[in-house]
Amino acid sequence: MNVAIITGASSGIGEEFVRQVARQTKIDEIWMIARRRQKLEQIGKTVKKSVKVIAMDLQIKDNIKQLEDMLKKEKPSIGLLVNCAGYGIRKEFSKGSLEEELGMIEVNCISLTALTYLCLPYMQKGGRIIQVASAASFLPQAGFAVYSASKSYVLNFSRALNKELKKSEIYVTAVCPGPVDTDFFLISDKGSKMPSYKKYFMARTDQVVRKAIADSNRKKSISIYGVSIWLLRFLTRFI
């Protein structure tokens, strides 16, 4: 059985990955991971694919151990891993709570790294890993300091890992979207208002995910949707 594991699967980009991956014939079952069981179950009923609902908070280390034990017991053949769980808080570093700032590192970096490590032994030749980073990874962002730094980690870790795993014919793609029309900003902008100009670059989740899957299939190390975000990446090389 060829399994896809998708974190952050209860909303936004993660939910869209579930829907689009469910249409792929090479995947037999989707493991959906997120905190909200009810939402996962609702989504699972709408896709024409066998699903396993795993309701857990990846910020809790005991849950990572629980997932490790599940993998050891079931020994799935993982064809695709999508690390989409993550969040950001937009406010000055000194004005945020320590719990918020460390939480971003726990979910965006540590949990992503742990899941990647735990899943690799179950991946075969031709396997794919998609890590959701952000255009915020391209340069430091005041007011979004920890988030942008955490996504820089995701980008650089993914690119390095892609080089390491090529000999095993497992390919890693870092997805670096700009603003996407999801609930992300309902959480991130509690501390401050999203810059108004970003609304003009807002992309749809289906567009970003479709491009990400296509780029992963093409064995690209980075997936960027939209000319404006490509231009941003190009310009940051000179800053």
Report the location of each language-model feature.
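Substrate-binding pocket helix/loop in short-chain dehydrogenase/reductase
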Residues: 92-102
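Residue(s) in the substrate-gating loop at a strand-loop-helix junction
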Residues: 134
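Conserved NAD(P)H cofactor-binding loop of Rossmann-fold oxidoreductase domains
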Residues: 84-89
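Conserved glycine-rich Rossmann-like NAD(P)H-binding loop of the short-chain dehydrogenase/reductase
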Residues: 22, 26-42
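Conserved glycine-rich cofactor-binding loop
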Residues: 10-11
